[in-house]
Amino acid sequence: MAHSVKIYDTCIGCTQCVRACPTDVLEMVPWNGCRAKQIASAPRTEDCVGCKRCESACPTDYLSVRVYLRNEVTRSMGLAY
């Protein structure tokens, strides 16, 4: 089941989320916005199982990576039945 994965620009490029993902949804891509010169990217969200291990692994205080489960996205859009 695909979930929405959002990467925020608060990412510090540490790769913790990439290593924590059991389904390889995340990868690092070049980015000049942080010291590490890389940022997490989520090119394979269709493989996301919603375990949120990437969120747990994120060392920043403001969660640079967030997983929105399918029902959370639907509810926030006012489409829940």
UniProtKB/Swiss-Prot annotation:
GO biological process, one term: photosynthetic electron transport in photosystem I
Single Gene Ontology MF annotation: oxidoreductase activity
Disulfide cysteine pairs (residue numbers): none
Cofactor or coenzyme needed: [4Fe-4S] cluster
Assigned EC number: 1.97.1.12
Enzyme class, broadest EC rank: oxidoreductase
Mode of membrane association: Peripheral membrane protein
Record: residues binding [4Fe-4S] cluster 1: 11, 14, 17, 58
Co-factor: note: Binds 2 [4Fe-4S] clusters. Cluster 2 is most probably the spectroscopically characterized electron acceptor FA and cluster 1 is most probably FB.
Alphabetized Pfam families for the sequence: Fer4_7 (PF12838)
One annotated Gene Ontology cellular component of this protein: photosystem I
Keywords: 4Fe-4S, Chloroplast, Electron transport, Iron, Iron-sulfur, Membrane, Metal-binding, Oxidoreductase, Photosynthesis, Photosystem I, Plastid, Repeat, Thylakoid, Transport
Catalytic reaction equation(s): reduced [plastocyanin] + hnu + oxidized [2Fe-2S]-[ferredoxin] = oxidized [plastocyanin] + reduced [2Fe-2S]-[ferredoxin]
Residue ranges constituting the 4Fe-4S ferredoxin-type domain according to the UniProt record: 2-31, 39-68
Gene3D superfamilies hit by this protein: 3.30.70.20
Residues binding [4Fe-4S] cluster 2: 21, 48, 51, 54
Described purpose of this protein according to its UniProt entry: Apoprotein for the two 4Fe-4S centers FA and FB of photosystem I (PSI); essential for photochemical activity. FB is the terminal electron acceptor of PSI, donating electrons to ferredoxin. The C-terminus interacts with PsaA/B/D and helps assemble the protein into the PSI complex. Required for binding of PsaD and PsaE to PSI. PSI is a plastocyanin-ferredoxin oxidoreductase, converting photonic excitation into a charge separation, which transfers an electron from the donor P700 chlorophyll pair to the spectroscopically characterized acceptors A0, A1, FX, FA and FB in turn.
Subunit relationships: The eukaryotic PSI reaction center is composed of at least 11 subunits.
Name this protein carries in UniProt: Photosystem I iron-sulfur center
